[in-house]
Amino acid sequence: MWNALKRLPLFPPSPKEDKQLRKERLHWRNMCPSLTETVTALFIHEKPTKGFRALGTGRFMSAFVAVFFNMGLSQKTRPVQLFGYILPLFLKPFVCTVVTTDVYDKDGRFVESKFEEIFNKHARTHKDALTAKEIKQMLKTNREPYDFIGWLSDFIEWKILHTLAQDNGLLTEDAVRGVYDGSLFQQLEKKRSSSSSRGKKQKLP
């Protein structure tokens, strides 16, 4: 996320820019509300907390991640450098970013070959999936020197992703791809909603 913020243009799509880039930027801007339950151009802790709860994380973890997320991005996205105890995060000035593994080019376009490189380089046990140990090694390999906040951010992002999307301890290529196109979040939310519905039915006399 931190590397992605440094790399992606922090402006809304322009009518004059490349059509493909404009399409992708609009895609991410449209995906942000569904992930964080954003109602306006800004959201506070309560919104991402609900969003992570919808994905299946516990109450404590949802609250922790939401505060960490807002603390890291609030100052970067505010139009003016003002202190805000609720740490508001403004979506308008930037393209929504996802887990960073350098799969974008300098213009913010998704590069398929770079995505596949993740598994070609780091998937040792299974060619189309990553184990927790392989993810840890990947993060260590991709570290930027002295970027301690970035290390922590990347570790938390991948740890949560592995916890929520792993299948028998494996994070599949399809699951990781789902992060970039937004489909994984919808799948996790539907899965949790379905589980909740079944639980309620079982409790009925």
Swiss-Prot record:
List residues, modification Phosphoserine.
183
- Gene Ontology CC terms, in alphabetical order: lipid droplet
Record keywords: Phosphoprotein included?
A: yes
Q: Where does it live in the cell? A: Lipid droplet
The UniProt keyword set, sorted, is: Lipid droplet, Phosphoprotein
Q: Which ranges belong to the motif Proline-knot? A: 79-88
Signal peptide start and end residues = none
Q: Which family does it belong to?
A: Belongs to the caleosin family.
According to its record, what is known about the domains?
Transmembrane regions are predicted by sequence analysis tools, but these regions probably constitute hydrophobic domains associated to phospholipids. The proline-knot motif (79-88) may be involved in targeting to lipid bodies.
- Name of the protein in its database record: Probable inactive peroxygenase-like protein
**Organism per entry:** Arabidopsis thaliana
